[in-house]
């Protein structure tokens, strides 16, 4: 009787919770919004939307695991399409075999990739294939490529953005030819790099900007770089950004994680794990920032900061692969080909390395004194030692 009473109370509580409005997380409603794209319907579909997301996939095989993986991605796309139904964003599937001609025409060459068509641009999504990540990415993509700053409060908000590459320019008006060039350059990098502009003399004075000048801010740096030789063409701005696109310290983000990981230096990444919300992680991150600021002119140095809180599904994998504890700050060098790694010895959270000690360790990495090949040698030694132990035990058994 007591159990029955508790069950009824439980159902009532759940029903009451479901009756509340304002926190209804979306669940797939079963309606098909993702359509198959073909040469026949391509132009019609393209005209219908401001953005078109195309999932380019290999033919669905008879393998059950492969079928389930495909269905999971299809459900993710259906949920994203449902959430963004009020936006002018379309979602389609492109079969690599059935629509090979269309895929070639669109320049698709990597099966399993998600491409977004916006105007005459094709953007490849190189991030985590998750509904929340995709929704945020697409919402950023439909925004204007340049955000206008016109007040002191907006300047403060701009200054607090420290973990993105950002640019800001001062122009006479939105009709200025130099602003138009800046806006067109911004479209090349949206939504990964943040572009801002102001037409306000007071804002420009506070940011020490001259007319038609653009400042480039590297992540976590105190001072910007004034792009030389103003005023600029679109091509000059694009070229400058591409040359400075790999910061000294950068954050791994779910929406561009694969592209960032592929942007290695000589096959390696210097990787730092630190939880920003944790006191020790925050302290370690501040040390990393200091090292980056002191070495920002070194083209061979790029540190990849990963906050484990951003990737909860990868924590166990990283701990197993790298043999480290991610509840503590860590820094190491990782071979991107085989995931071999060597990690700096940090005795405990209360004894974090100083900026000078970290710089010395990084210098050893860049010089090759510390490298992942040493880790391979140690593993081989361990294997040989195990084999010798096994041989000794076999000899003992024979003697008996």
Swiss-Prot record:
CDD domains, sorted: PDI_b'_Calsequestrin_C, PDI_b_Calsequestrin_middle, PDI_b_Calsequestrin_N
Post-translational modification Phosphotyrosine, affected residues: 282
What does the record list as GO biological process?
Answer: regulation of cardiac muscle contraction by regulation of the release of sequestered calcium ion
Q: How is it modified after translation?
A: Phosphorylation in the C-terminus, probably by CK2, moderately increases calcium buffering capacity.
Its assembly, as annotated, is: Monomer, homodimer and homooligomer. Mostly monomeric in the absence of calcium. Forms higher oligomers in a calcium-dependent manner. Dimers associate to form tetramers, that then form linear homomer chains. Interacts with ASPH and TRDN.
PANTHER family attached here? CALSEQUESTRIN, CALSEQUESTRIN-2
* Official protein name in the record: Calsequestrin-2
Origin species = Pongo abelii
């Amino acid at each position: 009787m007591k159990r029955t009473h508790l069950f009824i109370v439980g159902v009532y509580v759940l029903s009451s919770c479901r009756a509340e409005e304002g926190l209804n997380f979306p669940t797939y409603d079963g309606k098909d919004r993702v359509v198959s794209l073909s040469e026949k319907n391509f132009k019609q579909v393209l005209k219908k939307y401001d953005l078109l997301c195309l999932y380019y996939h290999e033919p669905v095989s008879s393998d059950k695991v492969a079928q389930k993986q495909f269905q999971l991605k299809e459900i993710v796309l259906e949920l994203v399409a449902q959430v963004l139904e009020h936006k002018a964003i379309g979602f389609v599937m492109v079969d690599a075999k059935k629509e090979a001609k269309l895929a070639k025409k669109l320049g698709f060459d990597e099966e399993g990739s998600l491409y977004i068509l916006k105007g005459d641009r094709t953007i490849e999504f190189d991030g985590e294939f998750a509904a929340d990540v995709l929704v945020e990415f697409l919402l950023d993509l439909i925004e204007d490529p340049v955000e206008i700053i016109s007040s002191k409060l907006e300047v403060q908000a701009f200054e607090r953005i420290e973990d993105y590459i950002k640019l800001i320019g001062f122009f006479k008006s939105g009709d200025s030819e130099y602003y138009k060039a800046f806006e067109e350059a911004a479209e090349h990098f949206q939504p990964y790099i943040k572009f801002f502009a102001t037409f306000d003399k007071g804002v420009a004075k506070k940011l020490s900007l001259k007319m038609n000048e653009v400042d480039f801010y590297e992540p976590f740096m105190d001072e910007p770089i004034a792009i030389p030789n103003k005023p600029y063409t679109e091509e000059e701005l694009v070229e400058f950004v591409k040359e400075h696109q790999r910061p000294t310290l950068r954050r791994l983000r779910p929406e561009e994680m694969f592209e960032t990981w592929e942007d290695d230096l000589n096959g390696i990444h210097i990787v730092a794990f630190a939880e920003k919300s944790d006191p020790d992680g925050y302290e370690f991150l501040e040390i990393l920032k200091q090292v980056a600021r002191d070495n920002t002119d070194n083209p061979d140095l790029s540190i990849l900061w990963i906050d484990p809180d951003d990737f909860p599904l990868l924590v166990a994998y990283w701990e197993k692969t790298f043999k480290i504890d991610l509840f503590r700050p860590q820094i190491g060098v990782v071979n991107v080909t085989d995931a071999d790694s060597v990690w700096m010895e940090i005795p405990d959270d209360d004894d974090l390395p100083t900026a000078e000690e970290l710089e010395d360790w990084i210098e050893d990495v860049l010089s090759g004194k510390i490298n992942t090949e040493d880790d391979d040698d140690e593993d081989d030694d361990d294997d040989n030692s195990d084999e010798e132990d096994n041989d000794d035990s076999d000899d003992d058994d024979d003697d008996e």
